[in-house]
């Protein structure tokens, strides 16, 4: 166990103030809205497919082209966040993607649909690296598991509230009203974020005692990157632990993104559900995964670390158990019973969701001082390159070829196994990389 964790587990430290938890709620709000767009395109997919006369392969392009641009921006946005800070990079990105979402509601023609999805991906790319960076700045390691789980689980919770909401708006009005509504909500939240977020030492509402508490126990106290981007990337890309983390996280991300984009369509085609029913059934596994991410990947991880257990042992145990449960989602392709299918998907999604906050915690602990956003962006790059782009587009192609989701789910199972192998055998002990 590290000296810092030992001290924090032995001392009865008073934790003054709650501003950092308000910040955590703010970060969760960003992720919910960031994923509302993805949930909307997923739930409204059948209506959009009819409106633009898209094949399943073309619909896969609509899903994946967002991820192409989102992925392309990961390394640039990581550098921008480390150099200019979370506040301004996120403010600018949120403002642009909010108005693009509103304009999306008025589009005509599939080429414009592709273009706007590409642009929204570019401007929303900062969300997860920014949340990871802000959490590392605002929270000491003993609280970081829960803080990471809150913003990570927000991505799942967006499906719980977003899927029924979008399904209602699409069935009551149309898909354009759904995107117009989401865009307006984004604008309002952007104004709130603009006013409230700042890093700890600049925040107007933080008490001196809470600031001292954060700075005393936190190894990450600056947003400024002390290294040139080129040498830093070379060092990180040639580090074995970084590859263990990137591919390990991708094992989670492939199944997550497949279910995020295709689950409503899976229910519709496999069980003949209407849009409203598929939206409601989609919310069930995501609600369970939200609870799992916070309870296991957050609270339970922090509990054992505060008890003095080594970070690496705690992280590895959660990853092995969580990913093992993740394979349960494959049971959904072996049954014709919708209840059994939802149970299998719920268990599998809950399992992998418990591992996601652990991945973000590992990223913060591995990254050289001042470069948390860069490493987080690299993890998100790998996750979205393989888990996002390939999962979304390959699933559409395989469905066109085979007429079912069976092969797509089997591919996801293989990637999940590969991720588990990299986490366990390539990542090794979680220790900060020194340059």
UniProtKB/Swiss-Prot annotation:
Chief place of localization: membrane
Gene3D superfamilies in UniProt: MFS general substrate transporter like domains
InterPro entries the record matches: MFS, MFS_dom, MFS_Na/Anion_cotransporter, MFS_trans_sf
GO MF, one annotated term: transmembrane transporter activity
Transmembrane segments: 26-46, 61-81, 96-116, 119-139, 150-170, 177-197, 242-262, 281-301, 325-345, 347-367, 385-405, 407-427
One Pfam match: MFS_1
Cellular location(s): Cell membrane
Annotated SUPFAM superfamilies: MFS general substrate transporter
CC terms in the record's Gene Ontology section: plasma membrane
Topology with respect to the bilayer: Multi-pass membrane protein
Sections of the chain in a coiled coil: none
Keyword Cell membrane set for record: yes
Keywords: Cell membrane, Membrane, Transmembrane, Transmembrane helix, Transport
Family per similarity comment: Belongs to the major facilitator superfamily. Phthalate permease family.
Protein's UniProt name: Uncharacterized transporter YybO
Organism the protein comes from: Bacillus subtilis (strain 168)
Gene that encodes it: yybO
């Amino acid at each position: 166990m590290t000296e810092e964790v030992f001290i924090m587990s032995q001392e009865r430290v008073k934790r003054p103030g709650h501003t950092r938890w308000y910040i955590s709620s703010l970060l969760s709000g960003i992720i919910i809205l960031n994923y509302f767009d993805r949930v909307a395109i997923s739930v409204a997919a059948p209506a959009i497919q009819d409106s633009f006369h898209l094949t399943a392969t073309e619909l896969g392009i609509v899903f994946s082209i967002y991820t192409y641009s989102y992925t392309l921006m990961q390394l640039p946005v990581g550098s921008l966040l480390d150099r200019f800070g979370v506040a301004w990079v996120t403010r600018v990105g949120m403002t642009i993607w909010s108005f693009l979402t509103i304009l999306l509601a008025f589009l005509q023609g599939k080429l414009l649909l592709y273009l706007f999805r590409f642009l929204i991906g570019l401007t929303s790319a900062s969300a997860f690296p920014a949340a990871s960076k802000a959490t590392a700045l605002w929270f000491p390691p003993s609280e970081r598991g829960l803080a990471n789980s809150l913003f990570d689980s927000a991505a799942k919770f967006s499906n719980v509230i977003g899927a029924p909401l979008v399904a209602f708006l699409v069935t009551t009005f149309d898909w354009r009203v759904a995107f117009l509504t989401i865009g307006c909500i984004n604008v309002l939240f952007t104004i709130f974020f603009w006013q409230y977020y700042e890093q700890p030492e600049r925040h107007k509402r933080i008490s001196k005692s809470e600031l001292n508490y954060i700075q005393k126990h936190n190894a990450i106290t600056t947003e400024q990157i002390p290294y040139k981007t080129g040498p830093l990337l070379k060092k990180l890309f040639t580090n074995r632990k970084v590859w263990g983390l990137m591919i390990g996280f991708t094992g989670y991300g492939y199944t997550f993104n497949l279910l995020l984009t295709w689950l409503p369509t899976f229910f519709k085609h496999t069980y003949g559900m209407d849009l409203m029913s598929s939206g409601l059934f989609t919310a069930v596994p995501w609600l369970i995964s939200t609870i799992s991410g916070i309870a296991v990947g957050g609270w339970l991880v922090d509990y054992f670390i505060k008890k003095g257990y080594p970070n690496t042992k705690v992280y590895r145990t959660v990853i092995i158990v969580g990913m093992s449960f993740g394979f349960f989602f494959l049971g959904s392709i072996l049954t014709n019973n919708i209840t059994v299918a939802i149970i299998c998907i719920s268990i599998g999604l809950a399992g992998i969701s418990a591992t996601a906050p652990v991945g973000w915690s590992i990223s913060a602990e591995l990254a050289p001082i001042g470069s948390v956003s860069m490493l987080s962006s690299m993890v998100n790059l790998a996750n979205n390159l393989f888990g996002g782009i390939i999962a979304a587009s390959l699933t559409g192609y395989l469905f066109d070829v085979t007429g079912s989701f069976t092969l797509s789910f089997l591919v996801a199972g293989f990637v999940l196994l590969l991720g588990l192998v990299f986490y366990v055998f390539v990542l090794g002990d979680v220790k900060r990389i020194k340059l």
